Amino acid sequence: MANKHNLCKKRSLDLSEESTSESHAKRQCTENLFWPEGEDDDSFFSNAHLEDLLDGRKEELFGTQATTSTNKMTQSGSDDGLGLFADTSFPSAQSVPPNSASKPDEASAPTDKHQIDLADEENADKLFKKINLNDLSIAEMEDIFHGADDFSDPMVQNTQLFLDAMTFKKPKTPEKLLAPLKDDSMSFISKSVIEGLVQGTQYVTCEELKNQSLLDPVNWETQAFADFEKNNQDIDKFPSKGEFYGLPDKVKKMILEHKGINSLYEWQDECLNLPAIRQRKNLIYALPTSGGKTLVAEILMLRELLCRERNVLFILPYVSIVQEKVSAMSPFAIDLDFIVEEYTAGKGKCPPQPRRKRRSLFIASIEKGAVLMDSLIDVQRPHEIGLVVVDELHLIGEKGRGATLEAFLTKVMFLNANIQIVGMSATIGNLSEISSFLNADVYTRGFRPVELKEYIKCGPDLLEINSAGQTLEEIFVPSRSVEYNYSEAVKRADPDHLAGLISECAPEHCCLVFCPSRKNCENVALLLSRIVPKHKFFEHRRSEKLDLMDALDKMCGILSPVLAKTLPYGIAYHHSGLTTDERKYIETAYRFGVVTVICCTSTLAAGVNLPAKRVIIRAPYVGQEFLTLCKYKQMVGRAGRAGLGEAGESILIAQSKDNLLVGQMLFSPMDKALSSLDQNEAVGLQSLILSVVGLNLAECRRDLNRLVNSTLLSVQAKSLEVAVNEIVLRILREMFKNKVLQLAEPQAKSKINSSDIITSQDVSQANRPAGDRRLLIGQSTPFKLTNIGRAAFKAGIDYKRANAIHKELKQAQQQLILTNYLHLLYLVVCFNSNERGDELFPADASILFGVYTSLPLDSQAMFKQLGFTEAHAARLFKTQSVQGPLSLQLNRLYKVLILADILNLLPIPSVASKYNVERGTLQHLISQSTAAASAIVRLCEELEEFWCYKPLFERILHKMDRCGTFELEPLMELPAVKINRARQLYAAGFQTIGDIARVRPSHLVQSLEHMPLRVATEIVSAAKIILMKKLDHLEEETENLKDCLKTSDKN
């Protein structure tokens, strides 16, 4: 028990005089309730006051903390002492007989006709007998089950079936772990896996890692920092500005004020005092989800900005998280006098404005961060960046953007510009390889702020995963059998007892249900809303749920039909089919405790920090792919809430057909982050070579080989069985063949060693005998990019896409239609189009025909120019299919018509309904098209022949990025302010950025409907940041003019 208690250690480094319980309570209130600034301040979605929000939650927030034990799950009761179930504990193997539980006081039971009297345990057993799905209409039943994924169990699942399947793998303790450990928090998975999973505390330098292939497990008591004071001469000296890790004392107060954190965890203090930090070495620190990694990164970034006075680049995986972090860091920027800049899609100037007085924190997506760094290298200013922080570093192994991240980091390392790299990662199986790639020290710790208890549900049986088990029987410990005495109809609808498992937890506590697909999220949410105890869920914070529904309807333009049915019960779904605004409202309501159950896809585990009392994994699948151990750990890591000592519980529902795969997943090594530079015809490596030649980081084969040998691909070449140098030679041949590269000087003047040459047919020469001429390139033969090659590099795309868009632009230039935006939008869509043009979604033939026939003649001209005649229209109507010779063009035109409606300011919900596209997918199309327009602008800047396109696409970019009227465009510069919020601000009299910057957040809350105080604070802070940037620009211009005058006086 003592060691178990270590998992829940309280923060050890006090930053204030407050007591622990008070600070935890205040932190909870600060995060969830947005403390108002005055008595008249309103909060959350309605005009409800803070007292209303606190009603019924005082015991939860300020009462005694929830306690946990080894064998029992705890749950807070309602105000009258009654929970939904009289006994919710998980008994151990020596389980307590069901009839031995004491009965609550019958007098306090609810009397509503929809709520069964739980005072009598016999009646409690019949809880779901009151719910009869047979009473529902046929239409309602179709709503639940239409299109649902089939998770029916071909065999009746039970514990024995599961354990029989587990015999494929007898757990064996590796020799390294045979020594007795004082820490019993070591997961059984790590014991049976051996490789790559680290628990306890460990700090390993990159030099030490070169001599070992994997990281050793370390227990809690290991003194990993005994040699901190060695090599003091290498410690990086920087001007200290206070006692808080060298930062001013006001930073400590701001962290408490804005984050509600009054002390650091022990590991955070250790990490901030590591030799890698003190000696300014690269560092990777890896901890489980919800361990508090981001706060360490923020302290390091503030220290770089304020103490070393160098800019910082913060790379985040998702645009929505970038925008949230921009908002969160804006108050710090105002008080500490630095600039925060967002780099996503069309936002962010490249290269950024140079500044003399203030430092900049660039917060960027992976793709835009790479473009930003390239622009700084191109103008010889990479030294302005002092620190690069990468969140979710393990995404370097993801296909697509993983190659972009790897190329970006390779260039930063190759520059040798004294830029420190700090990476945050989940626990992965090959940290030693990532460390070798980045030449970084590694800090790991198996830390969770609260205890996590993991369960597997096999039929009615719940098996607890015992962290200290040595055999299958010890690892999978029978805990209890769930039996809610469902009616027959409910049994058919909910064979996995989801409603019962959720009702044990919600609505007093929050619950996440991870589903394999987006459609399944909606189906499960509908199902739960039908069969959970109606009165208990319906009455819980009823008025605030109505306010939430009103906010979604007014601010997002639509209330989803599914959400309209589920939100009254505090149940919602969350996936990419919703717009960003819809997801934010649901997330905020969840943090408030208004929404208590979210049915979501796996992206919620990686992207948004929404802790839960209980996490249920509906099925071990992500889409069609089976769940990996890394994804599983991310999902279950959301269970438990720091600050109140509340333990977390996770339940994985396993069907008999998946038993073997579940076992293989649990006993498998942690996922490895593998390089994808060589994937998809090595397009990632092509782009890397293109950019390093364009940036003059490599001018010959020798330079290229040296750079490519510093990639993660090179580190993993042996295990991946990849011949990196051969791939580079093949890419060079293709680039010369496609006129992307050319010799830097005439071949006759080049000194070529015949033993070091590569050969390629010079295809540019027509009508010549085969093999007549060959291009000879030695190791030191200099080469450079052609015009089209440089255009591809500037646009941030591979040369094949550059050639394709060059062809489209050339053809359109001869007969460009400018009577509307359709032709320009077609070129934008071409930029992201695949071979069929059906990326994101295919065209709907019937809708396309209907829209085409209603278009005015000047708009139909675009169709005719692409060869679409009346005969094609008749065939489209007859076949109701876009298949055929014009399928590519028609799929593209379908997206063009959608974007045209968006530019004409039609509401997103209306456009989504008109074209039968999910709102979130539509928003993704807009974001993708904005990025494409930005890339086309950069491409055209490099090609003189396309001089006329640049202002046209700049206008398209501006309109798509704002999607608002002229008077609203200034307001939409604010992060996360969309068209509806901008209209609301404008109507309330806040018509300029200056109007917003001058107002107090509390006044915004009072003036606008559905404006939480935290959002108001972030909007005001963002407005001030925009004005600070404008002021900074004017000051720079003034200083430059002064310098010019001084120079002229001297002459």
UniProtKB/Swiss-Prot annotation:
Disulfide bonds: none annotated. One of its GO terms (biological process) is germarium-derived oocyte fate determination. Residues 497-689 form the Helicase C-terminal domain. GO terms for molecular function: ATP binding; DNA binding; hydrolase activity; single-stranded 3'-5' DNA helicase activity. It is found in: Nucleus; Chromosome. SUPFAM superfamilies: P-loop containing nucleoside triphosphate hydrolases (SSF52540), Sec63 N-terminal domain-like (SSF158702). Residues 1-28, 61-112 are annotated as: Disordered. Residues 103-112 have a biased composition (Basic and acidic residues). SMART domains: DEXDc (SM00487), HELICc (SM00490). GO terms for cellular component: chromosome; nucleus. Keywords: ATP-binding, Chromosome, DNA damage, DNA repair, DNA-binding, Helicase, Hydrolase, Isomerase, Nucleotide-binding, Nucleus. InterPro entries: DEAD/DEAH_box_helicase_dom, Hel308_SKI2-like, Helicase_ATP-bd, Helicase_C-like, HTH_61, P-loop_NTPase, POLQ-like_helical. It catalyses: Couples ATP hydrolysis with the unwinding of duplex DNA by translocating in the 3'-5' direction; ATP + H2O = ADP + phosphate + H(+). Disruption phenotype: Impaired meiosis, leading to maternal mutants with eggshell defects. Mutant females produce ventralized egg shells, with phenotypes ranging from fused dorsal appendages to fully ventralized eggs with no dorsal appendages. Mutant flies are hypersensitive to chemical mutagens. Its EC number is 5.6.2.4. Residues 64-78, 89-102 have a biased composition (Polar residues). Single-stranded 3'-5' DNA helicase that plays a key role in homology-driven double-strand break (DSB) repair. Involved in different DSB repair mechanisms that are guided by annealing of extensive stretches of complementary bases at break ends, such as microhomology-mediated end-joining (MMEJ), single-strand annealing (SSA) or synthesis-dependent strand annealing (SDSA). This is Helicase POLQ-like. It comes from Drosophila melanogaster.
